[in-house]
Amino acid sequence: FFFFGWIDNADSGYININGDKLEDMSEKKLTQYRRKHLGYVFQMYNLIGNLNVKENIEVGAYLSDNALDIDDLLHTLGLYEHRYKLPNQLSGGQQQRVSIGRAIVKNPDILLCDEPTGALDYNTSKEILKLIEEVNKKYGNTIIMVTHNEAIKNMADHVIKLRDGAVRHNDINTNKVSAEDLEW
């Protein structure tokens, strides 16, 4: 996860995204790359407690020259009616939706999701996975998701399994299912 954002360095090999080798970039170029091309969704929502839903999402918009329309995104996220609520007035699933909104509002090429359902119950997890699927279809972002939930791999186009930091399996999923049809 941290390699794609070039937050951590690899022991060997390199990462090439859109023809750019990340390890050859200066710190300034890496910062620009992260701002323009990457959106992050974490297991812990990391929302700003004294900002409402809309303001938390706007924080991500300031990083982009090509930000999405916030009101349209709030509708997509199912949060428009909650846009003036503070994070402590939201459920865990709603907070994760805000986190996804903050990541996607800047219209990144790649959305990095680190255990986005890890702290959620089954039903809320399915809702979040459906939302990620919808965001992918609507905005065309590449989604890279890290998860320990084996069932989630079934909704992916491409599945890479790691063990101790090394790639163990690298497969194309030819039997992709929708988030709605996932079971665990």
Show where each model-derived region lies.
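Short coil-to-helix segment of the ABC ATPase nucleotide-binding domain corresponding to the Q-loop/switch region
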Residues: 51-58
